[in-house]
Swiss-Prot record:
It comes from Paracoccus denitrificans (strain Pd 1222). Its EC number is 3.2.2.23, 4.2.99.18. Keywords: DNA damage, DNA repair, DNA-binding, Glycosidase, Hydrolase, Lyase, Metal-binding, Multifunctional enzyme, Zinc, Zinc-finger. This is Formamidopyrimidine-DNA glycosylase. Binds 1 zinc ion per subunit. Its cofactor is Zn(2+). The keyword Calcium does not apply.
Length: 281
């Protein structure tokens, strides 16, 4: 599932084609997604001006002038495709079948923006003006925002008897983090993913906040990580997977200079965790 860097990369790719533009035409081609499309989706979107395109956690929100917002989640395999004269020659990935094009928009410049989702776990929904979608109501601070501080994270960890990795994946504590980037940040911070969150010291929390930010910023700069389905809105792959230090590297030597450890994989709450048992305490 796309994590924060992948979603932010897609948002940035969509921004020139949606923000400030009018949706001249909209089609809902398959309403029976696992999260059904709103019956008035086409009516609300047609003629709407997108005044801002932002991200909250792993969601993309297109704020519409006087019409609320369009909320998008990519699910497991969702992709946003951009096609049109302004993009030059566009070659559709043969693995992306047109029958999985569920929502198609055309902006006032003729550019086509398509939500394609083979596994149909994605979501397209409408948020009424002045309302907040229930899925966004209880999210924690954005990890790249000023609200994500060592003090705030230490307060959230205080007294928690859950593994620190599980705490970081709790969207109520910090929004948008996922398995890949939590594993990478914990490695850089030298914290064992099995440590109880409440036992992480204040200096360790401060270091962890810095490493979370750094990993996310580096991943966004690389276009995210393309392990399976992720593509940027232009169709390009992300490249941060080539910079993984521990994620997916079970059995490889620890990359820390001078360390003789080997990257190990364990399962926590049904998810793989990768770490060096010598470097991470």
């Amino acid at each position: 599932m796309p994590e924060l860097p992948e979603v932010e990369t897609v948002r940035r790719g969509l921004q020139p084609h949606l923000e400030g533009r009018v949706i001249a035409r909209a089609e809902a081609r398959r309403p029976d997604l696992r999260w059904p499309l709103p019956p008035d989706l086409v009516q609300v979107l047609t003629g709407a001006r997108v005044v801002a395109l932002r991200r909250r956690s792993k969601y993309i929100l297109a704020e519409l002038e006087d019409r609320g917002s369009l909320l998008l989640h990519l699910g497991m395999s969702g992709r946003m495709l951009i096609e049109g004269e302004s993009q030059g020659d566009f070659h559709r990935d043969p693995a992306i079948l047109p029958r999985h094009d569920h929502v198609v928009l055309w902006n006032d410049q003729g550019t086509r923006i398509t939500f394609n989702d083979a596994r149909r776990f994605g979501m397209v929904d409408l948020v009424p003006p002045g309302a907040e979608h229930p899925l966004l109501a209880h999210l924690g601070p954005e990890p790249l925002s000023d609200a994500f501080t060592a003090e705030a994270l230490a307060a959230a960890f205080a007294g928690r008897r859950m593994p620190v990795k599980a705490a970081l994946l709790d969207q109520r504590i910090v929004a948008g983090l996922g398995n890949i980037y939590v594993s990478e940040a914990l490695y850089r911070a030298g914290i064992d993913p099995r440590r109880l969150a409440g036992a992480v010291t204040a200096p360790e929390v401060a270091a962890l906040v810095g490493h979370v930010r750094a990993v996310l910023e580096e991943a966004i700069a690389a276009g995210g990580s393309s392990l399976r389905d992720h593509r940027q809105a232009t169709g390009e792959l992300g490249y941060f997977q080539h910079s993984f230090r521990v994620y997916g590297r079970e059995g490889a030597p620890c990359p820390t200079p001078g360390c003789t450890g080997t990257v190990q994989r364990i399962v926590q709450s049904g998810r793989s965790s990768f770490f060096c048992p010598l470097c991470q305490q």
